[in-house]
Curated annotation (Swiss-Prot):
It comes from the Eukaryota. Gene3D superfamilies: Ribonuclease Inhibitor. The keyword Signal applies. InterPro entries: Cys-rich_flank_reg_C, Leu-rich_rpt, Leu-rich_rpt_typical-subtyp, LRR_dom_sf, LRR_TM_domain-containing, LRRNT. The chain crosses the membrane at residues 252-272. It comes from Mus musculus (Mouse). Interacts with KCNMA1. The transmembrane domain is necessary for interaction with KCNMA1. The keyword Acyltransferase does not apply. LRR repeats lie at residues 61-82, 85-106, 109-130, 133-154, 157-177. Residues 273-298 are cytoplasmic. This is Leucine-rich repeat-containing protein 38. Residues 1-31 form the signal peptide. Residues 190-245 form the LRRCT domain.
């Protein structure tokens, strides 16, 4: 007689062990985005896929993310909060238009950031705050027309900065002075205007020529009174000598405000003095009359 034995179901401990083994095999967040290639446990390659946004999901512990050649318009605000292990981000040739405040929160390990060939037009104060370990930052071939003097604050480890081929006409030297480890900076390919606002940057460039990989010949500027561009090598500190006697817009505001304040103070003082004199004149005749009355009584 054959006995029919019911199949055994795994005990709770066995099921938990099996699930644990599966998780170990899969690892933390091992999902690879559709159409991308995860060439190793810490690299995700999504280049030239026509993606409209940052792919999701992908391994949470990714260290190298390649998304160049897509149509991505923004970096999610919480992106680095979930992917804090990221060291290398290639974001070239996308449609990025702006960097929102807090975009790089949680990017404490990021060392290489390539944002070249995007549509950035402005960099605000603290644009890269929290990315203090950045070593190389490329912003080349964007449409940058303005860089805040505090745009690179906290980037104390930055060694390479690429600002070439943008629309910069001027740049506050304070933005560069905030980078103590800077070794290489690209400033060529911009429509610099050699006016008095450029004088401070010219002095900085003269003192840091060794940091310019293409030298002074590659950087050109337009002369305000002439319809031509010249290489910085053709200029000298003497070219900006007249700027020592010129006043900036801030200086003019201070002078105007001081003049108005002095004028108001003078008017108030004159009014007060006139009032005192008038009161004195009114009181003086009465005193003279009293003196005459006293003389008559005598």
């Amino acid at each position: 007689m054959s006995l029919c034995v019911a199949p055994r179901h795994p005990t709770g401990a066995a099921a938990a062990l099996g699930l644990g083994s599966l998780l170990v095999l899969l690892g933390p967040g091992r999902a690879c985005p559709a159409g991308c290639a995860c060439t190793d446990p810490h690299t995700v390659d999504c280049r030239d896929r026509g993606l409209p946004s940052v792919p999701d999901p992908f391994p949470l512990d990714v260290r190298k993310l390649l998304v160049a050649g897509n149509r991505i318009q923004q970096i999610p605000e919480d992106f680095f909060i979930f992917h804090g292990d990221l060291v290398y981000l290639d974001f070239r040739n996308n449609s990025l238009r702006s960097l929102e405040e807090g975009t790089f929160s949680g990017s404490g390990k990021l060392a290489f950031l390539d944002l070249s060939y995007n549509n950035l037009t402005q960099l605000g104060a603290g644009a890269f705050r929290s990315a203090g370990r950045l070593v190389k930052l490329s912003l080349a071939n964007n449409h940058l027309a303005g860089v805040h003097e505090a745009a690179f604050e906290s980037l104390e480890s930055l060694q390479v900065l690429e600002l070439n081929d943008n629309n910069l006409r001027s740049l506050n030297v304070a933005a560069l002075d905030a980078l103590p480890a800077l070794r290489t900076v690209r400033l060529d390919g911009n429509p610099w205007l050699c006016d008095c606002d450029f004088a401070h940057l010219f002095s900085w460039i003269q003192e840091n020529t060794s940091k310019l990989p293409k030298g002074l010949d590659a950087i050109q500027c337009s002369l305000p009174m002439e319809d031509r561009r010249v290489a910085l090598r053709e200029l000298s500190e003497a070219s900006f000598s007249e700027c020592k006697f010129s006043l900036s817009l801030t200086d003019l505001f201070i002078i105007i405000f001081s003049g108005v304040a002095v004028s108001i103070a003078a008017i108030i003082s004159s009014f007060f003095l006139a009032t005192v004199v008038q009161c004195f004149q009114r009181c003086a005749p009465n005193k003279d009359t009293e003196d005459e009355d006293d003389d008559e009584d005598d």
